[in-house]
Amino acid sequence: VETDEIIAQLDTFQARLFIRRNGQVEPADPNTLANNLLLIRGLLIQLVDKVAESESIYRKTKAARFDSFLTAHKPGEKAISKSAAMDKLDMEDDLIDMKIGSERVKNYMKYVDGLCTSIQSVLKVQSSSEKSQY
């Protein structure tokens, strides 16, 4: 499953967490919340794996590119310095895009995790108020 597909599934399950009632948006019933939270948490685990995989690819690509910068000089020419190679790496468009993509997914995961935590708090309040009614 690709990252974009996981995010699309997350969006679907997030939409089920809330309902419109009388022009207001409020949490869905406790069973719907609990079921969708489980699905969301499962998808978050998949996203963690995807982020780890993309960061590994980024690091390997960056290291290989760095090595190629250091070794890519003609005989008799002075080799590029490590700091110049690092500066050159910082300007590589594909590496920049890889890093930004990974950061976006990590930030999205933080948002979804915060949303789940908030919904879990709502569930606790709802279940404790139901228990106090008995």
Q: How should each PLM-predicted stretch be described?
A:
Residues 58-97:
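Extended, amphipathic alpha-helical coiled-coil scaffold segments used for oligomerization/tethering
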Residues 43-54, 90-113:
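Amphipathic alpha-helical coiled-coil segments
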Residues 34-67:
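Short, well-structured hydrophobic secondary-structure segments
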Residues 1-4, 25, 134:
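Terminal, low-complexity, charged helical segments
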Residues 10-45:
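Short, charge-rich amphipathic alpha-helices with coiled-coil/heptad character
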Residues 3-6, 30, 66, 82:
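Short amphipathic alpha-helical segments that mediate assembly, nucleic-acid/protein binding
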Residues 21, 55, 62, 69, ...:
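Coiled-coil heptad-register positions
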Residues 3, 10, 37-40, 112, ...:
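Generic L/I/V-rich hydrophobic alpha-helical segments across diverse proteins
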